[in-house]
UniProtKB/Swiss-Prot annotation:
Protein name in UniProt: Small ribosomal subunit protein uS7c
First-listed, main subcellular location of the protein, grouped into a coarse class: plastid
GO cellular component, one term: small ribosomal subunit
Subunit structure comment from the entry: Part of the 30S ribosomal subunit.
GO molecular function: rRNA binding; structural constituent of ribosome
Protein localization: Plastid, Chloroplast
UniProt-listed NCBIfam families: rpsG_bact (TIGR01029)
CDD domains: uS7_Chloroplast (cd14871)
Function, as annotated: One of the primary rRNA binding proteins, it binds directly to 16S rRNA where it nucleates assembly of the head domain of the 30S subunit.
InterPro entries with a match to the protein in the record: Ribosomal_uS7, Ribosomal_uS7_bac/org-type, Ribosomal_uS7_CS, Ribosomal_uS7_dom, Ribosomal_uS7_dom_sf
GO biological process, alphabetically ordered: translation
Record keywords, A-Z: Chloroplast, Plastid, Ribonucleoprotein, Ribosomal protein, RNA-binding, rRNA-binding
Amino acid sequence: MSRRGTAEEKTAKSDPIYRNRLVNMLVNRILKHGKKSLAYQILYRAVKKIQQKTETNPLSVLRQAIRGVTPDIVVKARRVGGSTHQVPIEIGSTQGKALAIRWLLVASRKRPGRNMAFKLSSELVDAAKGGGDAIRKKEETHKMAEANRAFAHFR
């Protein structure tokens, strides 16, 4: 038996302005080359644009977008008897949120547009309304899981 202790799960800190953990998770994913202040600027500009577009609370739009994109099931490649199967596996809420944030950022980076704040705000508004690339990615993942339901016992 291992004598090594189990690692404690780190809790996400909240950001200085909105006091929200989701915002901080999003900032940490936007972050490139250690430029956190730039990541905060991008997100806060995106939030202002969301406020202007929808005229509702931008944090509720953000929550709704992430809730809409969060997957319940993902597929993992499992090698069984020389062949690789895509095995559907349920994931927890934290992992699901992390995936949702990653998908939202990938989708917004792919978008044509002026700057990242504009693209991110557009993607978040679309995701909150039930459209956009990130939602399509979630549906695609769920379809894959449904198609490979026969391999669920390989968990």
